[in-house]
A protein has these predicted regions:
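Axial heme c-ligation environment in periplasmic c-type cytochrome domains
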Residues: 50-51, 76-102, 108-115
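Hydrophobic alpha-helical targeting segments used for export or membrane insertion
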Residues: 10-21
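Electrostatic cytochrome c docking/interface patches
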Residues: 19-35, 50-64
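Bacterial N-terminal signal peptides that target proteins for export
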Residues: 1-12
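The canonical Cys-X-X-Cys-His
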Residues: 40-47, 104, 108
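Surface-exposed, polar/charged faces of alpha-helical domains
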Residues: 57-64, 68-71, 75, 79
C-alpha cells in the first residue's frame, strides 16, 4: 500500500471516529436553541434597554462569564443568583432539566462566538 493510500485511510478513520461526537454536539446545540427560544430569549435577546442580561451580540460580556468556567455558568443558570445582576433559577422555567439548561448555556456561548 503506498503512502498516499495509507494517509487517506488514516484520515478517513479519524474523520469517522469523530462523527458521533459531532452528531452529539449538533443535537445538544439544537436542544439548546429550542430551550433558548422558549425560556431564555426574552431576557438574552431583547437589548440592554430591557434588562441587564448579557445579550447574544455582546461577546465581551460572554467572554467574561465564560472565563469563570462552564461549571460556574451552569450552576448559576440552574440555581439562579441575586444581587446587582440577577437571574431566576432555570431562567424562570422550573420545568427545565439540568441538561436542558446546560444545553441552552452552550448554545448561547456558541451564538456569542465562544466555544
Amino acid at each position: 500500500m503506498n503512502a498516499y493510500v495509507r494517509r487517506s485511510c488514516v484520515a478517513g478513520a479519524i474523520f469517522l471516529a469523530g462523527a458521533p461526537v459531532l452528531a452529539q454536539e449538533s443535537a445538544r446545540l439544537a436542544l439548546g436553541e429550542k430551550v433558548f427560544a422558549a425560556s431564555c430569549k426574552s431576557c438574552h435577546d431583547t437589548g440592554k434597554a430591557q434588562n441587564d442580561a448579557p445579550q447574544l451580540s455582546e461577546q465581551t460580556e460572554w467572554k467574561d462569564r465564560a472565563g469563570k468556567g462552564r461549571p460556574e455558568l451552569y450552576k448559576n443558570s440552574i440555581e439562579g443568583f441575586s444581587g446587582y445582576f440577577a437571574m431566576p433559577p432555570r431562567g424562570g422555567n422550573a420545568a427545565l432539566s439540568d441538561d436542558e439548561v446546560k444545553a441552552a448555556v452552550d448554545y448561547m456561548l456558541v451564538r456569542a462566538g465562544i466555544r
